[in-house]
Amino acid sequence: MNGNNVKIFGDYQTPMYFAKQVCEIIKKSYFTIPDIIIEPNCGLGNFLVAAQEFFTTSTLFGFDISKEYVKATQNKLPHFAQNIICNDLLKNSLRNLIDVKSGSEVLIIGNPPWATNSQISKISGNNLPKKTNLKNLSGLECKMGNSNFDICEYMILYLIQDFINTNTTFGILCKQSVARNVFEEVAKNKIKCSDFRMYNFDARKVFNVGVDACLLLFKISTNAHCLNQCNIYDFDNPSNIISTLNYTNKKMYSCLDKNSINLDGRCCYEWRQGIKHDCASVMELKKSDKIYINKQNQRLELEDTFIYPLVKSSDIKSMQLDKIDRYVIVTQKKPKENTDKIQTIAPKTWDYLNSHIYEFQKRKSVIYKDSPNFAMFGVGEYSFKKYKVAISGFYKIPLFSLISTDKAVMLDDTCYFLSFDSFNEAYMMMLLLNSKPVQNFLTSIAFLNSKRPYTKKILQRIDIKKAFENTAFDELRKIETTLKNLPYFTKEMYDELRNLVFDLNKKSAETELQYYNTKGA
């Protein structure tokens, strides 16, 4: 399997030397010899061959969707050839194919596909599981990226459900983000588990891919208890714990620091993600005098009506930003809004968009399905407010920037922001979010080694009321001095915003209570 097939199946074959290292760690970590070893996606069979060397008395089973791989693995393991079967894990449960007797010890090992459904669909792959809402996401969450589920994560959760009432150890290679999500699901659903570990390794060295990866090792057991902690080790030095994940009060923490102030709660403001259009070569522009220039280097005379300043993650380098040199065409003020009005209001812009209609039609994401031509996502009334306090989702150190120009500024979908009509409110919020209590709290709940440490889910956990209660006026004044501005922030402004936040927090709590009362009625 090579070329596009490798991409479609998310297929990274595990080198034999590494499969043996994985089996060695599993054997040293768990003293019970498995009766049955299963590789759900066996590929060329390296894991099963390695497992046979370390667990000589175990019965081996291997499955793969590829007949080519099944044949290759059968040839390597002739003694278990009848147990190496062509099977689609997500269409035919392994429990239907293997007789797991009561009390048997099972080991599931392997390296499931490292791909998301959107990555596969972009290259027209059909190797997708039937989409079920395992995490009970809302319709909006499903459309805006949480539905961009990782195939590996889906398979692990599926296998946990399949083997829930057995004594089964999982030793799976996966992305670190997948391992964290699996731990959260196991802890949240109180699945009995005797141990939970991650062994981080260099995927570039092993697979030549730039991904934060790990060996996920845990055991579900009928005799175990519910865990709320996951220890993280270095694969090359597996005896030392390098960090710990905790699941406490229904929340995940990357680092529980006793010295940091717990600001966990629900933000009384709504964090928003920037706009999404998936057509940067057409929609994103630079400007030279009165001429716009797109990424294809076309020089364009366009009306300014639907063109707005644009900020990306790489632009957020300071606590205030008011000089912006890139632009974006914004075709809608709310999702699904008809775009035909552009033809009348800005005919040059309309003609330009239509000249590139094929590029819009190539967009694969489900959010554009049944939408008007040139549709976007992540737009609403909040997009057009003059003042925004934004953060890049990518940086390790959280930096919040106050962004404003004469015209409303758009952010791309790598950024998250709060929007305001009032400069004073935005300015104060920027200072508060850059304060030490908020910064320390964020680094205790964010996963700094992930590609996108800061997400809406993380930011929405900042309780602004608690932040005010733990941040004095003088501390915010100190932050202001680093801006090298004339003193602007006053005690009256501080008290005014503090009162506003307390009122918003109260209303937010009342609304949430009303929602749950209605839901339970």
Identify what each model region corresponds to:
Residues 200, 392-410, 439-449:
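Short, ligand-facing micro-motifs at secondary-structure edges
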Residues 1-76, 80, 93-96, 152, ...:
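Class I S-adenosyl-L-methionine
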Residues 398-431:
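A short beta-sheet element
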Residues 200-201, 414, 436-464:
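Glycine-anchored helix-breaking recognition loops at helix->coil/strand junctions
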Residues 205-207, 214-390, 453-495, 499, ...:
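C-terminal substrate-recognition regions of SAM-dependent nucleic acid methyltransferases
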Residues 419, 427-443, 477:
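C-terminal accessory domains/tails appended to large, multi-domain proteins
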Residues 7-21, 25, 41-60, 64-71, ...:
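Signature of N6-adenine DNA methyltransferases within the class I
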Residues 35, 106-107, 388:
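Conserved acidic residues
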